[in-house]
């Protein structure tokens, strides 16, 4: 990092991918700090560390959600892993629009600063990540905090849209000779299946929050019934973005897991085409189920019946993916190295979260479970565990390719087990809290919920130790004192891998390929 010009004006996909990883790590640490503050407040009944400032509690909730979704998972998963891997995997010299790639990243730091500054303006933005009116309206949040948070969302949304345009163009037009779409690795497909929902859903969010901005500042009444508006309109627009967003966060992770499971089972992925069409199906179906977040707003009974059925149908392509991963492992010679541990952990935790989600998909049951800790448990199992474990798995899988040095295997496995035994006690008790009726955005609660909350808070402290362990591993791996050079193919996968990143040196040259590779066969698995 000694040459600032190289990093400020870089058009190299590997440099920009590295910047995304660093940014995601910084935002992730901030988001984790906020979550630990939340858990410290909830560790016991009554007012704890926040001294009864319930608005501050909601500001922490809001900042935690935005940081983790828009500034940690999306930049690290799509920006970091996508930028580093996609051009190499398809045999392209770089991304299609290198300078657009640069501005996509550099929109994020000012966006993050806007979000953090919103917490310092008057009483902060305590709206939750949904920013629903009338709570986000000018009467409830009179200062500039919500406006600052909305501006932050606009900037990060532009960044994501530009990035997705870049990925779609790169994958469509810049594949190497012989690299047809049906020969493309599954991670490439997963990024493509993520880029289209980003491109289609984020402009809808932009429209919704722009309406909110004009309601707050220019006296429009899009969300005010007194002027002919309707707050439910905003909910529809936000959720039309919000549900595809969940799949935007998890789909690249499923591509990473497919690579890892194949490599460490010593077998090609079972049902490659089925996996491709499952990812596309998830991307499409994600747009057809948004109102399952809105069963309590007074929807027509037929509408609720449709959204219940459509939500359950999403379980079909998800099941195809999970059974394909299990079939890939079945009968394979499995090596439980750190990436494989995180991949298997991600599959297990994602499955638990998905099964928990089938319950509130029923509109009748959701009346009881809506906005309780059951919903918090469900989406944290899918995201905080499914997506983040996939991120850890992918980082460990490709870290030798990035740094050119191997990571300490024992420490990596310790990181996995500490994190696994941290996140489960954190989020599993939330199912019981939700079933008991504990509502979500509250900093105080009756004594009857104290036991599960204490266990949940204890688990979050263990998770912090796991994150500390992760940074120790990264520091050791990247340090100049680490003399364990990484081979071009550290997992010895030449014979059972068809992906191009193992054919180049570690780390790859500034320009990855001296001459562009030609893909001549679809099956290079040699017995």
Curated annotation (Swiss-Prot):
Binding site for Cu cation: 243, 292-293
Entry's Gene Ontology molecular function annotations: cytochrome-c oxidase activity; heme binding; metal ion binding
Residues binding O2, per UniProt: 247
Parts of the chain that traverse the membrane: 18-38, 59-79, 103-123, 149-169, 186-206, 246-266, 269-289, 312-332, 339-359, 375-395, 414-434, 454-474
Keyword NAD belongs to the record: no
Binding site for Fe(II)-heme a: 64, 380
Positions of crosslink type 1'-histidyl-3'-tyrosine (His-Tyr): 243-247
Reactions catalysed: 4 Fe(II)-[cytochrome c] + O2 + 8 H(+)(in) = 4 Fe(III)-[cytochrome c] + 2 H2O + 4 H(+)(out)
Needed cofactors: heme; Cu cation
EC number(s) per entry: 7.1.1.9
Residues the record lists as binding heme a3: 378
A Gene Ontology cellular-component term: mitochondrial inner membrane
Cofactor annotation remark: Binds 2 heme A groups non-covalently per subunit.
First-listed, main subcellular location of the protein, grouped into a coarse class: mitochondrion
Subunit description: Component of the cytochrome c oxidase (complex IV, CIV), a multisubunit enzyme composed of a catalytic core of 3 subunits and several supernumerary subunits. The complex exists as a monomer or a dimer and forms supercomplexes (SCs) in the inner mitochondrial membrane with ubiquinol-cytochrome c oxidoreductase (cytochrome b-c1 complex, complex III, CIII).
Similarity remark: Belongs to the heme-copper respiratory oxidase family.
PANTHER family assigned to the protein according to its UniProt record, in alphabetical order: CYTOCHROME C OXIDASE SUBUNIT 1
Biological function: Component of the cytochrome c oxidase, the last enzyme in the mitochondrial electron transport chain which drives oxidative phosphorylation. The respiratory chain contains 3 multisubunit complexes succinate dehydrogenase (complex II, CII), ubiquinol-cytochrome c oxidoreductase (cytochrome b-c1 complex, complex III, CIII) and cytochrome c oxidase (complex IV, CIV), that cooperate to transfer electrons derived from NADH and succinate to molecular oxygen, creating an electrochemical gradient over the inner membrane that drives transmembrane transport and the ATP synthase.
Protein name: Cytochrome c oxidase subunit 1
Organism of provenance: Oenothera berteroana (Bertero's evening primrose)
The encoding gene: COX1
């Amino acid at each position: 990092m000694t040459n600032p010009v190289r990093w400020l004006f870089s058009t190299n996909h590997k440099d920009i991918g590295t910047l995304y990883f660093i940014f995601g790590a910084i935002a992730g640490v901030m988001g984790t700090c906020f979550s630990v503050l939340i858990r410290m407040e909830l560790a016991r009944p009554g007012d704890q560390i926040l001294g009864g400032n319930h608005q501050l509690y909601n500001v922490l909730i809001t900042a935690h959600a935005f940081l983790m979704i828009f500034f940690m998972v999306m930049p690290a998963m799509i920006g970091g892993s996508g930028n580093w891997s996609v051009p190499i995997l398809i045999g392209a010299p770089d991304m299609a629009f290198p300078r657009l790639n640069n501005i996509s990243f550099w929109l994020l730091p000012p966006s993050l600063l806007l979000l953090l500054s919103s917490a310092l303006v008057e009483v902060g933005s305590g709206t939750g990540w949904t920013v629903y009116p009338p709570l986000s309206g000018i009467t409830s949040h009179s200062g500039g905090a919500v406006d600052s948070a909305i501006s932050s969302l606009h900037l990060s949304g532009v960044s994501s849209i530009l990035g997705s345009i870049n990925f779609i163009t790169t994958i469509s037009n810049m594949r190497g000779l012989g690299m047809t779409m049906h020969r493309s690795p599954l991670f490439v497909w997963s990024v493509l299946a993520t880029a289209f929902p980003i491109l289609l859903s984020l402009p809808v969010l932009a429209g919704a929050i722009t309406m909110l901005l004009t309601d707050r500042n220019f006296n429009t009444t899009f969300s005010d019934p007194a002027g002919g508006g309707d707050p439910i309109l905003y909910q529809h627009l936000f959720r039309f973005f919000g549900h595809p967003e969940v799949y935007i966060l998890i789909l690249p992770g499923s591509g990473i897991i497919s690579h890892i499971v194949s490599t460490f089972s010593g077998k090609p992925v079972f049902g490659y085409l089925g996996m491709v069409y499952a990812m596309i199906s998830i991307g499409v179906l994600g747009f057809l189920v948004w109102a399952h977040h809105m069963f309590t707003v007074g929807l027509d009974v037929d509408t609720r019946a449709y959204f219940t059925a459509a939500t359950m149908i999403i379980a079909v392509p998800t099941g195809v993916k999970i059974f394909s991963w299990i079939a890939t492992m079945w009968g394979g010679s499995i090596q439980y190295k750190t990436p494989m541990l995180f991949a298997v952990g991600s599959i297990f935790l994602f499955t638990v979260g998905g099964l928990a989600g089938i319950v509130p998909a029923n509109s009748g049951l959701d009346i009881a479970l809506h906005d309780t800790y059951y919903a918090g448990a469900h989406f944290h199992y899918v995201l905080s565990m499914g997506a983040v474990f996939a991120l850890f798995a992918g980082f460990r899988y490709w870290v030798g390719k990035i740094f050119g040095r191997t990571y300490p295997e024992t420490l990596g496995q310790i990181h996995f087990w500490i994190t696994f035994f941290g996140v489960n006690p954190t989020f599993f008790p939330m199912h019981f809290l939700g079933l008991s009726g504990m509502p979500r955005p509250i900093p105080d609660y009756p004594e009857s919920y104290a036991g599960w909350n204490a266990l949940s808070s204890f688990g979050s402290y263990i998770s912090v130790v796991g994150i500390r362990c992760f940074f120790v591993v990264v520091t050791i791996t990247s340090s100049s004192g680490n003399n364990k050079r990484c081979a071009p193919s550290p997992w010895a996968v030449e014979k059972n891998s068809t992906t191009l990143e193992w054919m180049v040196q570690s780390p790859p040259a500034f320009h990855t390929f001296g001459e562009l590779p030609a893909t001549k066969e679809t099956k290079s698995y040699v017995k």
